């Protein structure tokens, strides 16, 4: 694929997170070279310049999907959107970068998992990508590998699971240790916030009651299970003074916990996803098993139909910060592994292609947020948190030319029949969305235009991320300087100190226990 060296995007409304302006955008060698009015006279196509007319359209920074799982081996199967198909679909939806997860098994090397995911992705990706790395166990080796990943491999985010007991779940003391190391190396800690112990017990209870269908998935993981874990994670992170990022915020209860924590000054960020913003958990009670199973994911969609609107309100007002898709797709025949037991249904839904349109429809078209906030929650905030800004997440001189020409008035109807993902269903089936990407530009190349791709596997590149992102660590460093407890200066105690007698007999122990119980 020959390089496309020069583009002029003419006459569009350039939208960044902080302001909008009508301007031309000149792109050369994969970056934005100039931004302003009437950069070149009409008809100047010299030296290979291609002019794209964006009059009446919006020119947006390419979307950054903070949460994907391409070709992920999980629950006995593997997600069907691989790094090629999944990233092509992302481009069709206006997303020009994804951040996927390298997830080692317990006892396995984090660095080896990272290299495995790199080997899967590098030859296939059609857009730029980066990797979070999961911490699924704890040891001195894990601690050292986190440091190596942050310093040498371009990883500045590590995810801990509070769910998936006996698979990925870590205990509180392990989470405290991992959070402490994140702070030491300048990374941001991420958590999947659900109480894994309660989920395990709840699943047993549902199956004992004869509830084997997809509704059992939500019934054993109610909102309280998500909210409790969210509060616990925030409490642990606050004790460490470590910045925290809550992935896939799915419930009103968990979102309220995050909003309250932000009002208390905690450095915490919440990530709702396209699924939770675009549909709800009433789907689990659908009479058709396959329809219900298609929506199974963890944490589950919530049956309260007001949840998507509530999450969008908090996303619009700043209580929630970014958006991902948690794209982890399994075909119906894979979901059918759990046809007689909901605990065996592979968890995951689509969203990488439809995230931008769903958020525009439910957020901007509904009047909840403006175009600038849309750019913030789909691109810029992620770039700032994960230390990609201003190369990503902004249209400015020197920024990467990851750009979308967006038609806010056009509509499209989402359907599995027309989407570009490998999965054979779509949880947003039939949704009419205002807001359609007309042209997607990745690394300075037009890779998608009017429904046609011009991109090959390997076009995208791995983007390393440096630690100590200023957007989050400025506050953390200042708090270390000003909020560290100090001892009270006082004169030493010089009075009498009693002598404790050693307990030598079982009777002494019993007596001591009785005395303590009546003190």
Curated annotation (Swiss-Prot):
> Phosphothreonine occurs at which residues?
510
The alphabetical list of record keywords is: Hydrolase, Metal-binding, Phosphoprotein, Zinc
Under SUPFAM superfamilies, the record lists: Composite domain of metallo-dependent hydrolases, Metallo-dependent hydrolases
Chemical reaction(s) catalysed:
5,6-dihydrouracil + H2O = 3-(carbamoylamino)propanoate + H(+)
Q: How is it modified after translation?
A: Carboxylation allows a single lysine to coordinate two zinc ions.
Binding of Zn(2+) 2 occurs at 159, 192, 248
Organism domain of life:
Eukaryota
One matching Pfam family: Amidohydro_1
Q: Where does substrate bind?
A: 164, 347
GO MF annotations, alphabetized: amino acid binding; dihydropyrimidinase activity; identical protein binding; phosphoprotein binding; thymine binding; uracil binding; zinc ion binding
PTM-bearing positions, type Phosphoserine: 79
Q: Where is the signal peptide?
A: none
Under which EC number(s) is this enzyme classified?
Answer: 3.5.2.2
Q: Which residues bind Zn(2+) 1?
A: 67, 69, 159, 326
Keyword Kinase found: no
Listed GO biological process terms: beta-alanine metabolic process; CMP catabolic process; dCMP catabolic process; dUMP catabolic process; pyrimidine nucleobase catabolic process; thymine catabolic process; UMP catabolic process; uracil catabolic process
Question: Which cofactor(s) does the record list?
Answer: Zn(2+)
Positions carrying N6-carboxylysine? 159
Quaternary structure, per UniProt, is: Homotetramer.
NCBIfam families assigned: D-hydantoinase
Q: In UniProt terms, what function does this protein have?
A: Catalyzes the second step of the reductive pyrimidine degradation, the reversible hydrolytic ring opening of dihydropyrimidines. Can catalyze the ring opening of 5,6-dihydrouracil to N-carbamyl-alanine and of 5,6-dihydrothymine to N-carbamyl-amino isobutyrate.
Name under which the protein is recorded? Dihydropyrimidinase
- Recorded name of the encoding gene: Dpys
